[in-house]
Design a protein with these regions (language model features):
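Small/aliphatic-rich secondary-structure junction motif
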Residues: 3-48
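Short, well-ordered secondary-structure micro-motifs
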Residues: 18, 45-49, 86-87, 109-111
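Short, surface-exposed alpha-helical segments at coil->helix boundaries
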Residues: 19, 48-59
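Conserved hydrophobic residues forming the short capping helix/wall of the S-adenosyl-L-methionine
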Residues: 26, 61-65, 89
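Short glycine/serine/threonine/alanine-rich loop segments
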Residues: 31-32, 70, 94, 125
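Conserved beta-strand positions in the Rossmann-like core of class I SAM-dependent methyltransferases
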Residues: 34, 73, 128
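Structural beta-alpha unit
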Residues: 67-97
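Gly/Ser-rich helix-loop-strand patches that form or flank binding pockets
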Residues: 88, 92-131
Length: 131
């Protein structure tokens, strides 16, 4: 456990907090982090802008990991967030997830908040939920 930690991010301060905790776990267990930014396929109207945002977020995550001595593997994809997180988790052999409980707007019911709820119900690996 904790060999490959998935950290989904939307670039919010809540996601940053989840990343900080994942980095601490990774340092303790000599783990790598699989950072995921998923462009929800239903938001294709602003695709270019969101893709640029996603790339910037992943660069920031990788830079932070490098500074802390933790290997970060980046994944930016377009699709259904839950389905594609499951695909990435299986392909990369993720064995745990560190995720925030709130979305960008501080809501527990929008975007990552609702996705978090679905992740908890779907995934059968350890999940660290960050408030």
């Amino acid at each position: 456990m904790f060999e490959n930690i998935m950290v989904p991010s939307d670039g919010s301060k809540h996601s940053d907090k989840a990343l900080d905790i994942a980095i601490e776990i990774a340092k303790k267990f000599n783990s790598k982090i699989t950072a995921v930014y998923i462009l929800d396929e239903s938001t294709n109207l602003f695709y270019d802008s969101l893709e640029n945002e996603g790339n910037e977020i992943l660069k920031k995550i990788s830079k932070k990991g490098k500074k802390e001595g933790v290997m970060i593997i980046e994944h930016l994809i377009t699709g259904d967030p839950l389905r594609d997180m499951e695909i990435i988790a299986k392909k990369t052999q993720v064995d745990s997830i560190v995720i925030n409980s709130k979305g960008k707007d501080n809501s527990q019911n929008i975007m990552i908040g609702s996705i978090t709820d679905r992740i908890i119900k779907t995934f059968e690996i350890p999940i660290v939920l960050v408030k």
